[in-house]
Amino acid sequence: MEPAAGSSMEPSADWLATAAARGRVEEVRALLEAGALPNAPNSYGRRPIQVMMMGSARVAELLLLHGAEPNCADPATLTRPVHDAAREGFLDTLVVLHRAGARLDVRDAWGRLPVDLAEELGHRDVARYLRAAAGGTRGSNHARIDAAEGPSDIPD
């Protein structure tokens, strides 16, 4: 894969993206504290929040606390980090992204919302959270959610 045109050649951008992708919390923290930019693209044009290990909510928190943009979209697929977290079934990461302002009502290049991906792949807890956060059925192809199954069921 060739580096993206106009991408950052700052080594710390590659280091931060690599640490985020591997879920290395302490390395991500150290790089951010040393001044690595949370939105700087790596040599392939991808931001750390786009390549982070989705199962590491703590990496997401660190990136977001240092100013990472939760709504950055992949230019080819239009997926955002919330699509990735929903597709992989990582509720903790999804909640962190949502609380940081990630939009749940955006479609990818195939017209799918994050809730659609969660439902397609059988991540019921994620789909339940997304439906509740969206106010029930908005954007979803499924029936209304039971009021007792809202975000209050999600651990902090």
Curated annotation (Swiss-Prot):
Outcome reported for the amino acid change (mutating residue 83 to N): In a lung tumor
UniProt effect for mutating residue 108 to H: In a bladder tumor
Recorded GO MF terms: cyclin-dependent protein serine/threonine kinase inhibitor activity; NF-kappaB binding; protein kinase binding; RNA binding
Effect of mutating residue 122 to S: In a biliary tract tumor
Higher taxonomy: Eukaryota, Metazoa, Chordata, Craniata, Vertebrata
Effect of residue 24 to Q: Found in a patient with multiple primary melanoma; partial loss of CDK4 binding
Annotated effect of mutating residue 77 to P: In CMM2; loss of CDK4 binding
Record keywords, A-Z: Acetylation, ANK repeat, Cell cycle, Cytoplasm, Disease variant, Li-Fraumeni syndrome, Nucleus, Phosphoprotein, Repeat, Tumor suppressor
Effect of residue 20 to S: In a biliary tract tumor
Impact reported for residue 84 to Y: In CMM2; also found in a lung tumor and a prostate tumor
Consequence of changing residue 14 to E: In a biliary tract tumor
Similarity comment text for this entry: Belongs to the CDKN2 cyclin-dependent kinase inhibitor family.
Consequence the record notes for mutating residue 68 to L: In CMM2; requires 2 nucleotide substitutions
Name of protein: Cyclin-dependent kinase inhibitor 2A
Annotated source species: Homo sapiens (Human)
Modified residues annotated as Phosphoserine in this record: 7-8, 140, 152
Result of altering residue 87 to P: In CMM2; impairs the function
Gene: CDKN2A
Keyword match Cytoplasm: yes
Modified positions (N-acetylmethionine) in chain numbering: 1
